[in-house]
């Protein structure tokens, strides 16, 4: 399963762990993803999305209807 946010499209990034001795080893920075259910009043049903914490703030700001309309316009929902 891909670790991708359904709303923002955030994906894992790559970087380095850096020790005190400045040794570098590769690592992945994973997005803070959570499965959340959102009640869509216009459709009278629950919608389950895998969203990042940034996407939760975006949904709080714009509303779930606007976010779903944007997802459908992109062909992702």
From Swiss-Prot:
Record flagged with keyword Ribonucleoprotein: yes
Superkingdom in the source lineage: Bacteria
UniProt keywords, alphabetically: Ribonucleoprotein, Ribosomal protein
One cellular-component annotation, GO: cytosolic large ribosomal subunit
Molecular function as annotated in GO: structural constituent of ribosome
Membrane spanning stretches: none
One family name in Pfam for this protein: Ribosomal_L28
Keyword Ribonucleoprotein: yes
GO terms (BP aspect): translation
Annotated HAMAP family: Ribosomal_bL28
NCBIfam families according to UniProt: L28
Family to which this protein belongs: Belongs to the bacterial ribosomal protein bL28 family.
Name of the protein in its database record: Large ribosomal subunit protein bL28
Taxonomic lineage: Bacteria, Pseudomonadati, Pseudomonadota, Betaproteobacteria, Burkholderiales
